[in-house]
């Protein structure tokens, strides 16, 4: 007799855990500044997962890699290949840590939105979600990428780097300048839009048909989350390579 009420309560609990609220934020007041606490908390969790996993996997490195060490060596080799392909064989080395950090942080952040029950942690306002579910995170990552490719170009070419803005003709100066503004915009909004849309679709499906239909969508979300991390890292490496090679 009590099976139906129990099932309904269970489904309601699952829906609450899976929910995503948009537009509500929780802030810390530090001095005269408001700090976006939600993004900081979830970002710290992601960083802790990355550092903890790396520390456990390589705490006792072996000449013949074990499972954890072998996995991280494979990830490093993958990141090196991406960097080498986009930046160039002679220049890619110093940029592997930056590209790798971007890829791993975005990848784990995206997956945390699907796998970690952030809703369990209650906040006075808003709720926790994947760091990349917030436009502040994606804009910050895109601006870091912009700083990186400007730095790469200026380091390689000096002030001659700015000559690319008048190539192949000075008439294209406004378009070439605008291109540098659209790069971070496209990077940030592509990542933010895809991750937010993925989580909202899962929430809607859970509310309509709990337990069954959302599962394949969640697996698809994990796949697309990984692809988005790869796209962001690949484009960041491509922009850095382009800034050192010249205008294309």
Curated annotation (Swiss-Prot):
Topology within the bilayer: Multi-pass membrane protein
Annotated function: Key component of the proton channel; it plays a direct role in the translocation of protons across the membrane.
Gene: atpI
A Pfam family assignment: ATP-synt_A
Similarity annotation: Belongs to the ATPase A chain family.
PROSITE patterns for this protein: ATPASE_A (PS00449)
Alphabetical UniProt keywords: ATP synthesis, CF(0), Chloroplast, Hydrogen ion transport, Ion transport, Membrane, Plastid, Thylakoid, Transmembrane, Transmembrane helix, Transport
CDD domains from the UniProt entry: ATP-synt_Fo_a_6 (cd00310)
Membrane-crossing residue ranges in chain numbering: 38-58, 96-116, 135-155, 200-220, 221-241
Subunit structure: F-type ATPases have 2 components, CF(1) - the catalytic core - and CF(0) - the membrane proton channel. CF(1) has five subunits: alpha(3), beta(3), gamma(1), delta(1), epsilon(1). CF(0) has four main subunits: a, b, b' and c.
Protein name per UniProt: ATP synthase subunit a, chloroplastic
Domain of life the protein comes from: Eukaryota
Keyword Chloroplast: yes
Compartments where located: Plastid, Chloroplast thylakoid membrane
Listed Gene3D superfamilies: ATP synthase, F0 complex, subunit A
């Amino acid at each position: 007799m009590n099976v139906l009420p129990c099932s309904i309560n269970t489904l309601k609990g699952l829906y609450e855990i899976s929910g995503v609220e948009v537009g509500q934020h929780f802030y810390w007041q530090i001095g005269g500044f408001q700090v976006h606490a939600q993004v900081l908390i979830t970002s710290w969790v992601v960083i802790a997962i990355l550092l903890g996993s790396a520390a456990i996997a390589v705490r006792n490195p072996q000449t013949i890699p074990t499972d954890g060490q072998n996995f991280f060596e494979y990830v490093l080799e993958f990141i090196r290949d991406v960097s080498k392909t986009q930046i160039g064989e002679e220049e890619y080395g110093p940029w592997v840590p930056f590209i790798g950090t971007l890829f791993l942080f975005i990848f784990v952040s995206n997956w945390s939105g699907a796998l970690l029950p952030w809703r369990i942690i209650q906040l006075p306002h808003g709720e926790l979600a994947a760091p990349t579910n917030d436009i502040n995170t994606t804009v910050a990552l895109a601006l870091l990428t912009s700083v990186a490719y400007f730095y790469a170009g200026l380091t390689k070419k000096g002030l001659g780097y700015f000559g690319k803005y008048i190539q192949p003709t000075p008439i294209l100066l406004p378009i070439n300048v605008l291109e540098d503004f659209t790069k971070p915009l496209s990077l940030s909004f592509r990542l933010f839009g895809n991750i937010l849309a993925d989580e909202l679709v899962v929430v809607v499906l859970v509310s309509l048909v709990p337990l069954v239909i959302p599962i394949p969508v969640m697996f698809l979300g994990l796949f697309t989350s990984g692809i988005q991390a790869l796209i962001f890292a690949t484009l960041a490496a491509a922009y850095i390579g382009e800034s050192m090679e010249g205008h294309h």
